[in-house]
């Protein structure tokens, strides 16, 4: 892990977020490229809503830098984001006005990559992956969601629920 003290902001109160960048390295025993799973608490939206580009945002530039420096393939996972946690954009208003947010997005990705590349506290783990799964029911109280289920847009099993405002609940799961 690495602490990233200077790259995030939370635009909603309360301002609470994790500054920890976590890296899991999968090292194949056949000599193929390592695969890094990076987990960091930030939405991938540094291009902002005013842009017209289709982009992978800063994770694209992070992945490129890591590929060049370590020849590792990267999967980025958005970490624990309870509010509106995004990356800090220096001179954001100027960059928006000058349509230069892409420059900032590249720099953000490269800087986060440098943090990932600096991680030196690796711990070897046994190659076992476990997961926990729990099913639960959610009241279908959203009329748009209920309609989408009723006409087949969303494939979901409905379960009768006398206490639900729509008369049914949906089964979902947390993994």
Residue ranges of predicted features:
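Non-catalytic substrate/cofactor recognition surfaces at enzyme active-site rims
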Residues: 1-175
């Amino acid at each position: 892990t690495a602490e990233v003290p200077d790259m995030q902001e939370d635009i909603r109160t309360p301002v609470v977020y994790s500054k920890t960048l976590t890296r899991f390295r999968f090292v194949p025993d056949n000599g193929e490229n390592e695969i890094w799973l990076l987990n960091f608490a930030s939405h991938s939206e540094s291009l902002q809503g005013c842009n017209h580009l289709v982009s992978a945002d800063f994770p694209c530039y992070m992945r490129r830098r890591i590929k060049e420096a370590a020849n590792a393939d990267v999967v980025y996972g958005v970490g624990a984001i309870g509010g509106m946690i995004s990356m800090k954009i220096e001179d954001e208003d100027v960059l928006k006005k000058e349509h230069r947010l892409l420059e900032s997005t590249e720099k953000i990705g490269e800087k986060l990559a440098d943090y990932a590349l600096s991680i030196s506290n690796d711990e070897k783990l046994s190659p076992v992956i476990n997961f926990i799964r729990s099913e639960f029911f959610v009241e279908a109280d959203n009329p748009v969601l209920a309609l989408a289920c009723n006409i087949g847009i969303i494939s979901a099993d409905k379960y009768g629920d006398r206490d639900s405002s729509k008369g049914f609940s949906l089964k979902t799961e947390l993994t």
